Each structure stands twice: as C-alpha cells, then as structure tokens.
Design a protein with these regions (language model features):
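Arg/Lys-rich amphipathic alpha helix in sigma70-family domain 2
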Residues: 60-67, 77-98, 111
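N-terminal module of bacterial RNA polymerase sigma factors
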Residues: 1-32, 39, 123, 170
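Helix-turn-helix DNA-binding motif, specifically the short coil turn and the N-cap/start of the second
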Residues: 43, 142, 151-156
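C-terminal edge and immediately downstream basic/flexible tail or linker adjoining helix-turn-helix-like DNA-binding
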Residues: 1-2, 13, 42, 120, ...
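A short pre-motif secondary-structure segment
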Residues: 132-136
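Internal acidic/polar
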Residues: 3-7, 85, 92-120, 142
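Short, charged helix-capping/linker segments at alpha-helix termini
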Residues: 15-24, 34-53, 66, 176-178
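Structural recognition of an alpha-helix C-terminal capping motif at a helix-to-coil junction
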Residues: 35, 49-56, 60, 69-81
C-alpha cells in the first residue's frame, strides 16, 4: 500500500473514531512536523510543545480533513498557525533562551558551529519567510504543498523561498556574493 493510500485509510478510520488510527498518523508524521516547527521557531523545546498542541488540535479537527488532502501539509498548517499564535502572544520571547547544548542532534554534514550559524540566520528571517524556507528547502515540500500548508498564495511562497534563500546565503557568506 502506498504511503498516501495508507494515510487515506488511517484518516478514514480516525474520522470514524479510531484513536489507534490517529496514533499511527501521529507516528508517521511527527518527525516531519517537529523538524518543520524546530526550523520555524528555532527552539526545540517550544517546537516539541507546539507539535503536541498541533496533534491535540488535529485530533479534534480530524473530521474536517478532506478526502485526498495531504496529511503532512494539513498538520504543518495547523502547526504553523500554533506557532504564529505563540509568536503573537509573546511566548517566543519567554521561551527564547537558546539552549544550544540541549540541541545534541547535528544537521547532516554540518558541525555545531555551522548549525548554530544557520539557526541564527533562520531566526533573523521574517516568520512567514522562515516557514516557507523550512518547508521547501529543509522539509522538501513542493511550493504547492507549502502554499497549502501555510495558507499562502503560491506566488508568495515562491517569493519567500527565493528571498529567504538569498538572505541565508548572505548571512552565511554564501557563493552568490550578496
């Protein structure tokens, strides 16, 4: 069974009230959601909290998920909205004590200094731009999937990715020399 067909079957079962099916959906998508939220907010502890809030909200809204819709994009959209709510409420400022020592996982091929520089540069991007970059460049979402997940027009997502990439390259001393 293809991953999309499995998701559709699990969604149908969860919509019928199966908490086991929803648990399987959580298992299948939690890594991608947490990775996106970690890049979007720059704080692992906050990202994990937001992921939990996202899954709670998703369970209560599972009936609203349309047949054939991308579960991953739907969850990232809910997570993004949770992140925006946290930013608006000032939670980011209260939580933003950057504990880089807690971040023991390193990005593939990048040492700790490179990872910290990337996290700092991502943190300097505007919220929507950061979310687009995190989804399209780090989580391998297509522009269309990111547009669906974030509720932004496709052209806006493309612009945010292009500008975000440029700003990251500039901040990190990238090859384009800008």
């Amino acid at each position: 069974m293809s991953p999309d067909c499995l998701d559709e079957a699990l969604v149908a079962a969860a919509q019928a009230g199966s908490s086991e099916a929803f648990s399987r959906l959580v298992e299948r998508h939690q890594q991608a959601l947490r990775a996106f939220l970690r890049r979007a907010c720059g704080n692992w502890a906050q990202a994990d909290d937001l992921a939990q809030e996202t899954f709670l909200a998703a369970w209560s809204r599972i009936g609203r998920l349309k047949a054939g819709a991308s579960v991953r994009a739907w969850l990232c959209g809910i997570g993004y909205n949770k992140h925006l709510s946290a930013v608006r409420s000032g939670a980011r400022d209260r939580i933003r004590e950057a504990s880089y020592e807690a971040d023991r996982e390193t990005a593939r091929g990048a040492d700790a200094a490179d990872r910290m520089a990337l996290e700092a540069a991502m943190g300097d991007l505007p919220v929507e731009q950061r979310a687009c970059v995190a989804l399209c460049l780090a989580a391998d979402f297509s522009h269309a999937e990111a547009s669906e997940a974030l509720g932004l027009p496709l052209g806006t997502v493309k612009s945010h990715v292009t500008r975000g990439r440029s700003r990251l390259l500039q901040a990190l001393g990238g090859p384009d020399g800008r």
